[in-house]
Swiss-Prot record:
Family, similarity comment: Belongs to the UPF0161 family.
Domain of life: Bacteria
UniProt keywords, alphabetically: Cell inner membrane, Cell membrane, Membrane
Name the UniProt record assigns to this protein: Putative membrane protein insertion efficiency factor
Any matching Pfam family: YidD
Keyword Membrane: yes
Source species taxonomy: Bacteria, Bacillati, Cyanobacteriota, Cyanophyceae, Nostocales
Role summary: Could be involved in insertion of integral membrane proteins into the membrane.
UniProt main location, coarse: membrane
A GO cellular component annotation in the UniProt record: plasma membrane
Record's subcellular location: Cell inner membrane
Mode of membrane association: Peripheral membrane protein
Signal peptide location: none
Amino acid sequence: MKQIFIWLIKGYRMFISPLFPPTCRFQPTCSMYALEAIERFGVFRGGWMGIRRILRCHPFHPGGYDPVPEVGEHCCHHDSGK
């Protein structure tokens, strides 16, 4: 299943993405982020991380450098202490 999603993202990057001007506000791009997240964390967790990243990619977000966290690194943005 993981390879299917990786193949779909690579297909998007190769055939669909070049048809539109670059608009991603982040580095790495959202599709590259999703690809790396799925490779590193698997389809469910990595896919969820990719979806959250795409939802943050809009004109009202400043964007910038936002790499995929390493395995074991805290990657969720919730407040666990309060």
